Amino acid sequence: MRAAPAAPLLQLLLLLGPRPEAAGVAEPPLPTVVLAILARNAEHSLPHYLGALERLDYPRARLALWCATDHNVDNTTAMLREWLAAVGDNYAAVVWRPEGEPRSYPDEEGPKHWTKERHQFLMELKQEALTFARDWGADYILFADTDNILTNNQTLRLLIEPGLPVVAPMLDSQTYYSNFWCGITPQGYYRRTADYFPTKNRQRRGCFRVPMVHSTFLVSLRAEGTGQLAFYPPHPNYTWPFDDIIVFAYACQAAGVAVHVCNEQRYGYLNVPVKSHQGLEDERVNFIHLILEALVDGPPMWASAHVSRPPKRPSKMGFDEVFVISLARRPDRRERMLTSLWEMEISGRVVDAVDGRMLNSSVMRTLGVDLLPGYQDPYSGRTLTKGEVGCFLSHYSIWEEVVTRGLAQVVVFEDDVRFESNFKGRLEQLMEEVEAEKLPWDLIYLGRKQVNPEEEAVVEGLPHLVAAGYSYWTLAYVLSLAGARKLLASQPLRRMLPVDEFLPIMFDQHPNEQYKAHFWPRDLQAFSARPLLAAPTHYAGDSEWLSDTETSSPWDDDSGRLISWTGSYKTLRGPRLDLAGGSGHSLRPHPRDEL
């Protein structure tokens, strides 16, 4: 299918001013750049994509927009039109090329299915954008897929500075997927190399020559050899797979044009593509997870204020309450957590955590808090900290509220949660399955550190649930009314130990018999999601790691001194975390990498 000829003026907004020239300035003007925007069914990511383009630190008078959209079944066209109407006058030139019909390709099985006709049409569009940039006299053209979010506002300047003919900013994703290949076979297929992971993980930093970049990359239109580059038609000798990214890689190779990827900076994010049989909802869920990852790892994504977005409809997912324990003096954590819940459309309620730094012996005596005789941290040998007392009291207050209000089931989050992909959908499905099996339960871990996962048995009829063994952390769990009653009935305040040590005692899985002897009955029915649905945002040793329980005063020390116990095994990134789909946990390349 050939790209359609230029549309009538009513369909094509072509605001072509003369190429900006320097006028009375001491320094030469910045190079001119065309931003090529090709959007299809991008409603879920366009607001953040366009917001990132708006924030690029680059004069609008030196930028042109080339925008095309086609074959949409969502609101992509209206979003782009709204955005161009709001910001288009700020740019040196704007090309607007929408196609309302058809809404799909004849042979496609769904909107994420790549047919030969779709590949060809995309190549023709990219070629049209490239031709426009050359005719307009631009110095560069930036291709950036609409689910690639350039959170670094210096991206254009940083890519232009080294003077490379074709260069990509290395983008991060939810997995090890990125926008470059380190190896390619003689037949044009992906080849694994020893360089990929050190590059992707930034164990080696710089700008490196690679055989292919895709999704987001900058092409210098002044560099030697780039005048021969083309997306369509393919090179006369081309025999590799019919795919736009491979066609362009071959064109670079044939023209002798070096291709580089740069990873010294964090430039932004790209969404892991869904499989061909999946739909737009799967892609939307993936992108929400990418937003959440950016909130943790930074910098965050910001949506354009010039685009109307579908309204959010937060819910409690069928629970009576969704509690978020958060210290008032950690507003950044609270804001991140509430933003994460909002993005997932989860309605949460903040519970101000008890601040261990505000506790003293007098307050704890008034509350009836006393140390469990003989308690020591299992790894550092230290005693209970005031931070751990505050943490326990925070959870305890929620258990009390559950019983007082008669809440049938609740979710409890701490404010350092990293959510796994499709957290909301997977939790809702898990609870539906638990209800269908009529499983009696008191507590279900959603995130924890397993000590002996090989000893945990899958619950019959519930493949995503295991009987919980000895575990650390209380960052995310589901609690029933019956479970809250059991926890309170054990009167734990007068024989306190960390809350994540207390819970395994209550379901009789703690290895310390002396500790267990202080509590009876130990009949809490505890389970865990498998794979886990949440993990900590950071671990001991990470640059952003911070703990108000590990960096604290001993429980009976009123001097105010803070001691950091950072070597506890509990806070380290352990190999026994049962995670799936999270950042850095999947080593399998995406199918498109195996072309």
Curated annotation (Swiss-Prot):
Pfam families membership: Glyco_transf_25 (PF01755)
Subcellular location: Endoplasmic reticulum lumen
Disordered as annotated region, ranges: 576-595
GO CC terms, sorted: endoplasmic reticulum lumen
Statement: the UniProt record of this protein carries the keyword tRNA processing: no
InterPro entries: Collagen_mod_GT25, Glyco_trans_25, Nucleotide-diphossugar_trans
Family designation: Belongs to the glycosyltransferase 25 family.
Function according to Swiss-Prot or TrEMBL: Probable cell adhesion protein involved in leukocyte transmigration across the blood-brain barrier. Does not express any beta-galactosyltransferase activity in vitro.
Protein name: Probable inactive glycosyltransferase 25 family member 3
Organism field: Bos taurus (Bovine)
Recorded name of the encoding gene: CERCAM
